[in-house]
Amino acid sequence: MGIVRAHLRIYGRVQGVGFRWSMQREAKKLGVNGWVRNLPDGSVEAVLEGEEERVEALIGWAHQGPPLARVTRVEVTWEEPKGEKGFRIIG
C-alpha cells in the first residue's frame, strides 16, 4: 500500500454540525494527515493524505459525517502526495 492524496468537496448540511472537528478526530484515529475547512458556499473542503486503505476509510466516513450532518454529495479528486504532516482545521 502506497501513500495517496485525496482532495474532497463535501456538500449538504455540513457546516455548523461539528464536521471539521469530527473529521480531525477520525483522521487522527486513522493516522491520516491533511486539513479541512469550511467554504463560503456552505460546503467543506478537505485534503487527506496517508496509506490508501486509511484514506479510503476516511472518505467512507465523510459520506456520513457526524450525527447532525446530512451529506448529499462527496467529490473526490486524486492528486500526487505532497507530504502533509498532522491534520489541521483551517479557518
From Swiss-Prot:
<dbReference type="InterPro" id="IPR001792">
    <property type="entry name" value="Acylphosphatase-like_dom"/>
</dbReference>
<feature type="active site">
    <location>
        <position position="20"/>
    </location>
</feature>
<protein>
    <recommendedName>
        <fullName>Acylphosphatase</fullName>
        <ecNumber>3.6.1.7</ecNumber>
    </recommendedName>
</protein>
<dbReference type="InterPro" id="IPR017968">
    <property type="entry name" value="Acylphosphatase_CS"/>
</dbReference>
<comment type="similarity">
    <text>Belongs to the acylphosphatase family.</text>
</comment>
<dbReference type="InterPro" id="IPR036046">
    <property type="entry name" value="Acylphosphatase-like_dom_sf"/>
</dbReference>
<keyword id="KW-0378">Hydrolase</keyword>
<feature type="active site">
    <location>
        <position position="38"/>
    </location>
</feature>
<dbReference type="GO" id="GO:0003998">
    <property type="term" value="F:acylphosphatase activity"/>
</dbReference>
<dbReference type="InterPro" id="IPR020456">
    <property type="entry name" value="Acylphosphatase"/>
</dbReference>
<feature type="domain" description="Acylphosphatase-like">
    <location>
        <begin position="5"/>
        <end position="91"/>
    </location>
</feature>
<dbReference type="Pfam" id="PF00708">
    <property type="entry name" value="Acylphosphatase"/>
</dbReference>
